[in-house]
From Swiss-Prot:
Keywords: NAD, Oxidoreductase, Tricarboxylic acid cycle. One of its GO terms (biological process) is lactate metabolic process. NAD(+) binds at residues 11-16, 35, 97, 120-122. Belongs to the LDH/MDH superfamily. MDH type 3 family. It is an enzyme of class 1 (oxidoreductase). Its EC number is 1.1.1.37. The active site is at residue 177. This is Malate dehydrogenase. It comes from Rickettsia conorii (strain ATCC VR-613 / Malish 7). It catalyses: (S)-malate + NAD(+) = oxaloacetate + NADH + H(+). HAMAP family: Malate_dehydrog_3.
Length: 314
């Protein structure tokens, strides 16, 4: 009988718990749910295993406060870190979460150096960079969850605008995971037809698409403003699962993720959202799109924002 993959989730908050539930339902592998708060991962693991019995899932879930339990993990998803609170500057958040990420990275290096690592913790582009540098893992095995989520938001808003199924929509969002992200209408399609062509047919307008692009950029902020006490977790978790499944099943899907660039798009030693192919070796290749001068200018501005954030931790 084939042994299940071992998947460790670092952080047992809303995203961590949702990840565990989705992994269990899809039976992607056995789960280690880690958190520094005693009782929380153990309680959630028990609750999730009991939910699994109803769904017919035989996946094992272990809650723990001991990093040693992640030993030999095939894949690790990291959500540990503080959310940004009212009155907290971006710099404060970077400082606190960098400290947390360094601790996580040291333990990943010690116990699971062969794992494929997906980082979700914000500020994403900085945290995934810290994970790479502190863990010493190869760059093709460390990626950040960003573009899949941003594209899912863009997809939804486009589906609503054109009154079609989300299954008909494919969109592309590049750049940093923040306000300066670059949703690309030219590379986004409805059943293979590019958005600019649909505008020419009179099915939408440039003004409407620009509004959708702005709403996509503020997608996370819109949810934070509505929830008041937290941030999105269902869609971020579902996005990470898409990436995880492509790795575990060698699906070779092309997904937009924060990837470590080494000259692609003219970017060196930074994590930026670009389309990549994910398979059993991790990142198999970076897909380099041909950008117009205007798109490249927006992309470069987004990269500059990431660069400035990285400078704050050096």
């Amino acid at each position: 009988m084939k042994q299940n993959a071992k998947i460790s989730l670092i952080g047992s908050g809303n995203i961590g718990g949702t990840l565990a539930h989705l992994i269990s339902l899809r039976e992607l592998g056995d789960i280690v749910l880690f958190d520094v708060t005693e009782g929380v991962p153990q309680g959630k693991a028990l609750d999730l295993m009991q939910a699994g019995t109803i769904a017919g899932s035989d996946i094992k879930i272990k809650g723990t406060n001991d990093y040693k339990d992640i030993e030999g993990s095939d894949a690790i998803i990291i959500t540990a870190g503080l959310p940004r609170k009212p009155g907290m500057s971006r710099e404060d958040l970077i400082s606190i979460n960098t400290g947390i990420m360094k601790t996580v990275a040291a333990n990943v290096k010690k116990y699971a150096p062969d794992a494929f690592v997906i980082v979700i913790t914000n500020p994403l582009d900085v945290m995934v960079y810290v994970m790479l540098k502190e863990s010493g893992l190869p760059h093709n095995k460390v990626i950040g969850m960003a573009g899949v989520l941003d594209s899912s938001r863009f997809n939804l808003f486009l589906a609503e605008e054109f009154k079609v199924s989300v299954n008909n929509v494919n969109s592309m969002v590049l750049g940093g995971h923040g306000d300066a992200m670059v949703p690309l209408a030219r590379y986004s399609t409805i059943s293979g037809v590019p958005i600019p062509d649909l505008i020419k047919m009179g099915l939408s307008s440039n003004e409407n698409i620009e509004k959708i692009i702005d709403r996509t950029r503020n997608g996370g902020g819109e949810i934070v403003a509505l929830l008041k006490t937290g941030s999105a977790y269902y869609a971020p978790a579902a996005s990470a699962i898409e990436m995880l499944e492509s790795y575990l099943k060698d699906k070779r899907q092309i997904l937009t993720c924060a990837a470590h660039l080494q000259g692609e798009y003219g970017v060196h030693d930074l994590y930026v959202g670009v389309p990549i192919m994910i398979g059993k070796e991790g990142v198999l290749r970076v897909i380099e799109l041909q950008l117009t001068a205007e798109e490249k200018a927006l992309f470069d501005k987004s990269v500059e924002g990431v660069k400035k954030l990285i400078e704050t931790i050096k």
